[in-house]
Amino acid sequence: EEYSTMPVKNFSSVGAFSFPTCHFTGNIHIGRFCSIASNVKIMGGNHPLNRFTTHMMTYNGEFDKFAKSEFERSWTLKPFITKPENPIIGNDVWIGNDVVLKGGIAIGDGAVIAANSVVTKDVPPYAIVAGVPAKIIRFRFDSNVIDELLRIKWWNYNYSDLPDNNKCDDINYFVEEMNRLISNGNIQEMDYKKFNLSEIFRDL
């Protein structure tokens, strides 16, 4: 989307006003208004744990070719999916330095991941997690406020139309004002433009 920054050396799906400063491998979905620090990484490929070996010899086609060329024998392979899906990062997510994310997990809206954490499971919305493996330390707000924020989805609006920023640390004021603005029709969702950079560069 417009007003976003693309991760270093990679094309990804990045929402408006998100600023990843790290190098992600492969396409990854990042929501709006995210702050992602340097050296955040995604775990490498999987290996089978329930086979006699974790080695790639049981599923990598090169080992069948090698067996035929060197030993004049065939080597039966059993399929194994080594690369999981990339993580999905929600909106208003803050990820600290040197965090490692497991593939296929979902980071909920408003979540915070402390620096040096290793995240192996989904992170609920507005949870603050830390550690190896990462565990929930606390939530940013109480459950009622979280439910309201997830319903309001403030990141879908132009930030300059949001309630008085001088009171941005009063979450109850923010929720009440957003509900008032929405119910009165005084705030409209922002239609951010989307760009496909691979198509743009291909057409140059």
Where are these regions (language model features)?
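Acidic, glycine-centered active-site loop in nucleotide-sugar glycosyltransferases
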Residues: 125, 130-133
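A generic "structured core" feature
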Residues: 94, 108, 112-114, 118
